[in-house]
From Swiss-Prot:
It comes from Megalopyge opercularis (Southern flannel moth). Probable toxin. This is U-megalopygitoxin(11)-Mo28. Residues 1-29 form the signal peptide. GO terms for molecular function: toxin activity. Expressed by the venom apparatus. It is found in: Secreted. One of its GO terms (cellular component) is extracellular region. The keyword Magnesium does not apply. Its main location: secreted. Belongs to the caterpillar 11 family. Keywords: Secreted, Signal, Toxin.
Length: 41
């Protein structure tokens, strides 16, 4: 029960961060692209 609640909290937090990232216009698209490239590399 406790682990399920923890996972739910994590999922909500991640969704909030993702929605904020998509809602806010990227001030530095080049920096964002570089971050994605470094993550996928």
């Amino acid at each position: 029960m406790r682990t399920t609640l923890l996972l739910l909290i994590i999922a909500i937090t991640v969704m909030v961060f993702v929605s904020e990232a998509y809602a806010a216009p990227a001030p530095e698209p080049i920096l964002k692209q570089g971050t994605i490239e470094s993550l996928t590399r």
